[in-house]
Amino acid sequence: MSSPDFKLKAEFKPKGSQLEAIAGLVKDLEKNPEKSKQTLLGVTGSGKTFTIANVIEKVQKPTLVIAHNKTLAAQLYNEFKEFFPENRVEYFVSYYDYYQPESYIPQKDQYIEKDAQINPKIEQMRLRATSAILSRRDVIIVASVSCIYGLGNPELFKEMGFELKVGEKIKRSDIIEKLVDIQYERNDMELVPGRFRVKGDTLDIIPGYQDDILRVEMFGDEIDRIYELDPKNMSKKHEIDSFYMYPAKHFVIPEEDKKNAINSILKELDEWLPNLDMLKSHRLKQKTLYDIEMIEETGSCKGIENYSRHFENRKEGEPAYCLLDYFPEDFLIVIDESHQTIPQIRGMYKGDRSRKQSLIDYGFRLPSAYDNRPLKFEEFKKYMNNVIFVSATPGEYELDNSNQVVEQIIRPTGLLDPEVEIRPIENQVEDIIKETEKMVEKGERVLITTLTKRLAEELTEYLAKRNVKARYLHSDIDTIERTEIIRNLRLGKFDCLVGINLLREGLDIPEVGFVGILDADKEGFLRNDKSLIQTIGRAARNANSKVVLYAGKMTDSIKKAVSETERRRKLQKEHNEKHNITPQTIVKPIREKVVDISDVKHIPVADIPNVIVELEAEMYEAAEALEFEKAIKIRDTIAKLKKKIK
C-alpha cells in the first residue's frame, strides 16, 4: 500500500513543553513499536493536538483518534485537517440523527420498535473513512466511540470492490451488474452518492464515499476514458487511468453467504424455540420467518444487524468487525480526554447486553442478537499496541498501564494555571454577584458551576432579578444552540454563564476572568479532584483569571486539585522567569452566527420581554428580505417565549 508521507503544515513551531513531549512520545513509539502505551498529561491550552500532530508526522503511522462525544470529535477533525491538508483526515461518528433502539419493557408489556433517522452526509463520511484506510497509509480518522460498534467485514468490503481501468475489456452490462452487487442503485433521474445512471456508452457514478461524479466512457466493450466531474456544473476536473470502486454500503453480502446465513438462522430458531413458552415461541417464529422472507425478497429486513453473526459466519460470542479492523496492525490509537473516553468504552457492552436480554427472554429476538454488539473493553485492549492517552487529568487505568507519563505543563503562550481561592459557602451567591460586577467593569465574563440543573435554573433567575445578565446551559440544548449561547457570551450579550458538568472539557473562552465553583466540598463525580482540575482549567485562557471554590470544609478532592494546580503554576512561573516571558491572554476569533436560537428554556423569565422585542424586530427584517422560512422560525420562538411568561 503506497501513499504519500504525512506532512504537517502550521504557521508556528513547537514551544513550551511541546518539544520535550514530542521527543518523549516519539522515542517510546520507536523503542517499543508493538507495545507502546503512553499518557500525555497536558494542561488545558498547552496545545496537545499540535503535539500529537507532530508525533504523527514523525512516526508516519495511520492514526485513529477517539473522542468521547461528537462535538469534540468535530473540533479535532477540523484541527487535524488544518495541520495535514495534503493527507487524508476523516470523520467517523454515529450516522443517526435520531435513534430509538429496539427494546421491550416487561413490567408494562411494552415493545418498542427500532426507529432511526440516518444522516446521509455522515454515512458518506464513514464510507470515505473506511475506503481511505483500506487504500493508503497517510490517514487520520477522528472517531467517537461509534468506532467499537459492528461495521461489516473489511476484507469482504475490499474484495467485493472492483477496479475500473482505461483500456480494460469489459461489457457495459457487466459493470452495471458489478455495481448492483455492491449496493449501488441505478437512477437515471437523480444522481447522489451510492447511485449511477446510464446513457448510451456513458456511465455516471457517484461512489458512496465522495461527491464528485465518476464518468466512464465506453468504446464497444472497452473502457475508453475515465474522468471526474464537478456535480454542480458538470465541468471536467481531471482525467484518470483507473479507479477502485468500493461498495456503497459497509454491509455487503455475496449471494452464496446470504443462503448460508438463512440456513444458519433457521437452525438457531429450531434449537431455541423449545426453550420458550407457547406465546413467546409463536412470536419469535412468526417474526424470524417474516425477516427471512424479507431478506430473500429484498436483501434486507428491519433489524437485519441482529443476524450479523450468521451473515459474517462468526462463532457464538465472537466480536463483530468494527472500524479498528480496517486499520493495518501497526496503527496508532490516540484516546482524547481519556479520563472520560476509557470509562465510556468500558460501559458500552454492558448497556447493550442488558437491553437485548429482555428482547431475547421474551421472544422478540434470537440469542445471536447478543453478538451484534460493541466491543468489550478486554477485546478493545487487544488493538492497543500503540496508544497515547491524552488528558489534563488521566485516570487510574491510563496511569497504571502506561510505559511513561509525558507531562506538557508549559503553555506556548506563557499563561499560568489560574490562582485558586477557597471561600466560605455562606453568602456564595452574593459573592458571585460582586465578582460578576467587577468582571463586567473589566469587560470579562463569568462561569459558574452548580451541582444540579434545578439549582442552575434558580440561580440564573435570581441573578437576572439582581440585574446580572445570565444564561444557563443544560443537557437539552443541542450542539448548534450550545455553540450559539457560548458565542453570545463571548460577544458580551450576557456576562454570566451557569452550568453543571457542561463547563468542563471543550469549553475554552478566553474572555472568562472568573470561575466560581459552588458547593465545592460536596464529594462526588462533579466535585472529585479530576472534575475540579478540569473546571479550574476553564480559566486558563486568560492572563488575569481566578477561580474560587466555595466550600465549608477542605475535602481530599479540593486538597488534591489545589495542590496539583499550585504545582503546575509554580513550574510555569519558573519557566516564564527563566525565559523572560510575559503571559498573554489568548486571542481567539469569534465565529460567525451559526443558527438562530430556537430553544428558549435557558432564558430567565425576567429577560423574556426584552428578548421578544429583539426577536420581533429580527422577524420583520427577515420578512422584508423575503426570508420567510427564517421569519416563521422566529415567530414560533416568540410564541414559545410568550407561553413561558403567561
From Swiss-Prot:
ATP binds at residues 42-49. InterPro entries: Helicase/UvrB_N, Helicase_ATP-bd, Helicase_C-like, P-loop_NTPase, UVR_dom, UVR_dom_sf, UvrB, UvrB_inter. It is found in: Cytoplasm. Residues 428-590 form the Helicase C-terminal domain. CDD domains: DEXHc_UvrB, SF2_C_UvrB. Keywords: ATP-binding, Cytoplasm, DNA damage, DNA excision, DNA repair, Excision nuclease, Nucleotide-binding, SOS response. A motif (Beta-hairpin) lies at residues 95-118. GO terms for molecular function: ATP binding; ATP hydrolysis activity; DNA binding; excinuclease ABC activity. The keyword Nucleotide-binding applies. Residues 29-411 form the Helicase ATP-binding domain. Its main location: cytoplasm. It comes from the Archaea. The keyword Secreted does not apply. GO terms for biological process: nucleotide-excision repair; SOS response. It holds the Pfam family UvrB_inter. Residues 609-644 form the UVR domain. GO terms for cellular component: cytoplasm; excinuclease repair complex. Belongs to the UvrB family. The UvrABC repair system catalyzes the recognition and processing of DNA lesions. A damage recognition complex composed of 2 UvrA and 2 UvrB subunits scans DNA for abnormalities. Upon binding of the UvrA(2)B(2) complex to a putative damaged site, the DNA wraps around one UvrB monomer. DNA wrap is dependent on ATP binding by UvrB and probably causes local melting of the DNA helix, facilitating insertion of UvrB beta-hairpin between the DNA strands. Then UvrB probes one DNA strand for the presence of a lesion. Forms a heterotetramer with UvrA during the search for lesions. Interacts with UvrC in an incision complex. The beta-hairpin motif is involved in DNA binding. This is UvrABC system protein B. It comes from Methanococcus maripaludis (strain DSM 14266 / JCM 13030 / NBRC 101832 / S2 / LL). The gene is uvrB.
